[in-house]
Amino acid sequence: MSNRTALVFGGTRGIGAACVQKLAESGYDVAYTYVTSAPNLPAKIGSSKTKGYAVDICQPAQVAQVFADVARDFGGAPHCVVANAGINVPPGPLAQFDPENFRKLVEVNIVGAFHVLSAAARNVRDGGNIIALTTSMVRVAVPGGGPYTASKAAVESLLRSMSKELAPRKVRVNGVAPGPVDTDLFRAGKNEEAVARSAAMSPFNRVGQPEEVAEVVSFLASDKASWVHGQIIQPNGGMV
């Protein structure tokens, strides 16, 4: 997989950082984005080059610019784009849900994802692939989780359309929808009892690890997944 470049949006923590590591180990040079302070990540992982860029995905000009920067710094457009950047907010029943928190979810998880996926569709190389992170919770009714899962369901709808639109260019489009994964984003606002309830949703009685999700992303980014297109893969430990 030499001389291929991946661009990971939201690549400095949790699942995103694991994706950067795994894609680099699989042979990709990896560009990644962050929001504020530059992360302390190495400039190379093994023989693969890595470089970070400050990008607010809610600003379409910044999203467009990072594709130009990656083309300049890595010798061309990316072969793979991973749309991982997003937020969560405290859950709650719809009747009492803070409208401002819902607005934030829409702004980042839907509008921001739209900017990333739209730019990816314009810039990814022919024969490349686009992967977006969503959530298995889209298919599970969980009290209090409706606003967040609605924002991720919107991303899945965009992916389904893109899979048809980009097929003439042989660009594969897929989603990865993990169940609960042990990240800072997942643990924010949860006590240990809430974490245990999430773990109990899997028959293995645990939550996933970022590296387990990154393995799926790496597979989809590889030639081994050449016949996987328009799919939502759910690494969730059997959560049904």
Label every model-predicted segment.
Residues 91, 218, 229-240:
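Short C-terminal tail/terminal secondary-structure segment
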